[in-house]
Amino acid sequence: MRMTRDGKEHEYKKGLWTVEEDKILMDYVRTHGQGHWNRIAKKTGLKRCGKSCRLRWMNYLSPNVNRGNFTDQEEDLIIRLHKLLGNRWSLIAKRVPGRTDNQVKNYWNTHLSKKLGLGDHSTAVKAACGVESPPSMALITTTSSSHQEISGGKNSTLRFDTLVDESKLKPKSKLVHATPTDVEVAATVPNLFDTFWVLEDDFELSSLTMMDFTNGYCL
């Protein structure tokens, strides 16, 4: 029962359509065209709501609907479209001329799914993905392994915390870019000569040469 704008209540019929109701609907559409489905009950006396009239026309009474058996070409097209679009029947039906979304859906559920061996959708998904452990068991395993890692590394963590605390107590040394003194440079010069493969007897440096080399090294 539905309330109209004028305040009157209309009780619409539900269930199967009769031959007389189909004839009334077909005559109305031939005369007035498709659309304005809610006006049919007022103008024809048909005790059906606008939605029911629209679905009845589009799925059964329209001359554009192919009510024959599905061909092999249509089956192949529906299967390929279903792989791309899934259960979006309205989009699939638009690409299958003469078929409605209701026809395509019913034909898939009653014929094609069984033909492809899919059966129940949930069963097919489990078969494709394989048997997996329950999420709860995986969570328990992960938690246990994490606990062992934490327990095993407890001592190292404590030692790291101790080092961090000790580092906080030590004053931070400031980096100072100071120029090395002559004494420091002279102390490092012998180490430089150790890298040269030269005999002391064959090569001697005078004090002046030593100072020149030192000055050049500093620069």
UniProtKB/Swiss-Prot annotation:
One of its GO terms (biological process) is trichome differentiation. SMART domains: SANT. It comes from the Eukaryota. Pfam families: Myb_DNA-binding (PF00249). Keywords: Activator, Developmental protein, DNA-binding, Nucleus, Repeat, Transcription, Transcription regulation. InterPro entries: Homeodomain-like_sf, Myb_dom, Myb_TF_plants, SANT/Myb. Expressed in roots, seed coats, leaves, stems and flowers. Detected specifically in trichomes, and in the cell division and differentiation zone of the root. Gene3D superfamilies: Homeodomain-like. Residues 9-61, 62-116 form the HTH myb-type domain. One of its GO terms (molecular function) is transcription cis-regulatory region binding. One of its GO terms (cellular component) is nucleus. Residues 37-61, 89-112 bind DNA. It is found in: Nucleus. PROSITE patterns: HTH_MYB (PS51294). Its main location: nucleus. CDD domains: SANT. PANTHER family: TRANSCRIPTION FACTOR MYB8-RELATED-RELATED, TRANSCRIPTION FACTOR WER-LIKE. Interacts with BHLH2/EGL3/MYC146, BHLH12/MYC1 and GL3. Transcription activator, when associated with BHLH2/EGL3/MYC146 or BHLH12/MYC1. Regulates the epidermal cell fate specification. Mediates the formation of columellae and accumulation of mucilages on seed coats. Controls the elongation of epidermal cells positively in roots but negatively in stems, leading to the promotion of primary roots elongation and repression of leaves and stems elongation, respectively. Ovoids ectopic root-hair formation, probably by inducing GL2 in roots. Controls trichome initiation and branching. This is Transcription factor MYB23.
